A protein has these predicted regions:
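Generic helix N-cap/helix-start motif at coil->alpha-helix transitions
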Residues: 2-10, 21-24, 35-44, 322-330, ...
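TPR/TPR-like (Sel1-like) alpha-helical repeat modules
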Residues: 33-36, 50-73, 81-104, 353, ...
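Short beta-strand->alpha-helix linker/helix-N-cap micro-motif
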Residues: 128-218, 279
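"A position-specific structural signal for the A-helix of alpha-solenoid helical repeats
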Residues: 10-13, 43-47, 80-83, 87, ...
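Structural signature of tandem alpha-helical TPR/SEL1-like repeats
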Residues: 18-28, 52-61, 346
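Amphipathic beta-strand/beta-sheet edge segments enriched in Tyr/Trp
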Residues: 195-266
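C-terminal/domain-edge helix-coil "capping" segments
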Residues: 96-127, 235-363, 370-381
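Inward-facing hydrophobic residues that define packing positions of alpha-helical scaffold repeats
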Residues: 27-29, 61-62, 311-315, 349-356, ...
Length: 411
């Protein structure tokens, strides 16, 4: 343990390359300290644990170091998480006979409200009216050499779900099919037989919104053809809302056009506010984020670095956006992290309190999240400053916030 990080990293690499695993087990691991020896040495330890198939030790180590400020290594540790979780799944599958099929998630609320104790006071609770609309995942047709089309197939419907919730009273739902691993991306166009089947199951359904992402990728321009359309189930006609070539840089520039065309189609029934061009990473991360928050595979407690990435993305979204939804997104995530990955809270606390101190939670809605932030961090002094404002809140808000407060004020 007296050796510095460079020596330990080199020793691990040499022993590993020469397959001297007993040397690692006997001479390195008993003295290994990730805080002292750093991320590179930790990575080499994880390589050894992978070879020796010690997935429990590896996942414990990965979770332990997620509390450290090693954010530049986030993607590397997420990769390790995925590998060791898969190893754990394989072991557990060999000892069980579980076989879960596909399920359907139907939502018409922002994804931040998932597992956030039904915050009706912060949602659009107006009565939904016709026409009725069903949003389906976009099809992803053709071979691709990047993850962009697959991510976009689910991310765009989730983006539209969030926008429509706040900006319209349309009777709409987003339907996503998923298994115990991920959301399913359709590989073929929706045919008329399938649409007729949906209509037969939902006689009051007026429209289906979906799209196709045609993967004619070539390394010179790295673009894909995106088509977004609405299908009228009553007269069996298709209207194209958008048809463009897109890549990761241009997709956000097309979103205002898509929203405008959608509003025109519905004759102004959708009241989109001033549109902020979001960070493309924030949009493309939506599917993975929802998969983690829903704990599709039951291993979210082992995904500390996945949560770490989502958390810092949520912080950046608050900085870049004036939208209240970004604030709710962050605080709902902090609430879930407190329950399953509390080790992440301390390192992000200075950022959270800087956001509070610099006025990022001053709108009428977002300011009501402050007591929850202070409660998460057991900050009784700041919490007490908001006691009276809580008592003056509307009944729905008071009932909701009381579900989260983990101690009682001294007042």
């Amino acid at each position: 343990s007296d050796y510095n990080s460079e020596v330990v990293t080199a020793a691990l690499a040499i022993y590993g390359n020469n397959k001297k695993y007993d040397e690692i087990e006997n001479n390195i691991l008993p003295y290994f300290n990730p805080v002292k020896h750093g991320p590179h040495a930790t990575s080499n330890v994880l390589k050894y644990l992978k070879i020796s198939e010690k997935y429990e030790d590896a996942l414990y180590l990965i979770k332990n170091v997620s509390s450290l400020n090693w954010n530049q290594f986030t993607n590397e540790f997420i990769k390790y998480e995925d590998e060791f979780i898969q190893m754990k799944k394989n072991y557990e599958a060999a000892n069980t006979n579980t076989n879960s099929g596909s399920k359907v998630l139907s939502i018409s609320r922002p994804i931040w409200s998932n597992n956030f104790k039904n915050p009706t006071w912060a949602l659009n609770m107006a009565e939904k009216t016709k026409p009725s609309l069903l949003i389906l995942p976009f099809t992803n047709i053709g071979e691709t050499s990047t993850s962009f089309p697959k991510e976009l197939s689910i991310a765009l419907p989730l983006f539209l779900n969030d926008e429509l919730h706040y900006s319209s009273n349309l009777k709409y739902h987003l339907a996503l099919t998923y298994n115990d691993k991920e959301f399913k991306v359709p590989k073929n166009n929706y045919n008329t037989d399938y649409i007729d089947y949906i209509k037969a199951q939902n006689p009051d359904l007026d429209y289906i919104l979906s799209g196709n992402i045609l993967s004619k990728w070539d390394k010179e321009d790295n673009r894909y053809e995106l088509e977004v359309y609405i299908y009228d189930t009553n007269i069996s006609t298709k209207t194209t809302l958008l048809k463009e070539h897109v890549d990761e840089n241009s997709i956000v520039d097309l979103l205002p056009k898509l929203l405008n065309n959608l509003n025109l189609f519905f004759n102004g029934l959708i009241d989109f506010k001033t549109f902020e061009t979001p960070d493309v990473e924030n949009i493309l991360l939506k599917p993975k984020k929802l998969e983690v928050l829903m704990d599709l595979d039951g291993y979210s407690r082992d995904r500390s670095w996945a949560y770490n990435k989502i958390l810092y993305n949520a912080v950046n979204s608050v900085i870049e956006s004036e939208n209240d939804s970004a604030r709710f997104d962050l605080v709902s995530l902090l609430h879930q992290i407190m329950q399953i990955h509390p080790q992440l809270l301390s390192k992000v606390k200075p950022l959270i309190y800087n956001l509070v101190g610099n006025g990022y939670f001053i709108s009428e809605k977002s300011s009501k999240l402050l007591p929850l932030i202070f409660s998460i961090y057991s900050d009784e002094d700041n919490y007490n400053n908001f006691v009276e404002s809580i008592r003056r809140g509307n009944p729905d808000y008071i009932e909701w916030i009381n579900k989260f407060l983990y101690y009682t004020s001294n007042e």
